[in-house]
Amino acid sequence: MNVISVLSDSDFAGCKDTAKSTSGHIVLLNGGPIAYYSGRQTTVALCTAMAETIALAKLVVKIKYLRALLHDLNFCQTRETNVDSTIVWVDNTAALAVATGNDYTHETLKHVTVKVRFLQECVQRKIVRLSYINTHKNISDMMTKQSSGPQFKAHRDFVMGYTDIVVSHSASASFAVRVRRRTVRLRV
């Protein structure tokens, strides 16, 4: 069973010079990180929903590429429920509403219509399934914002492979995390 999960986040107007937002995500394959990204967005977002939507659109392009690559390597995504959607965890309910097409309209999102339509198509075709995650549990927060020392250390240890985080998905799309300390032995 190969399960691809992604945690996505964006800050809002984090750059003091340009007012551009920073996007970040961590891609997990069977609970272990295989890719991560943190970078400045190319356009200025007018609200947090727009910043998160821009981040999601860029992320879904990467997910489609990774799924094709993993398929070529015989790491097809399968689950016991026969749903092969990649689960993307997002901590912004407005961005979820925009991407899933749940009658959310906002004047400031008009000029990202193409990205919104792309996201909605990927959700409808079940390439991705978007789910909400509390911002305090979102590991990709470390890619976009400063965090407290203990929280940063826990997220850093996971990304660097010092701890395992087991991601479990229930039918209600809840997110559970179990952290297990990994022992690393080096031979010299």
Features from the language model and the residues they span:
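RNase H-like nuclease module associated with reverse transcription
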Residues: V3, T42-V188
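RNase H-like nuclease fold core
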Residues: V3-A49
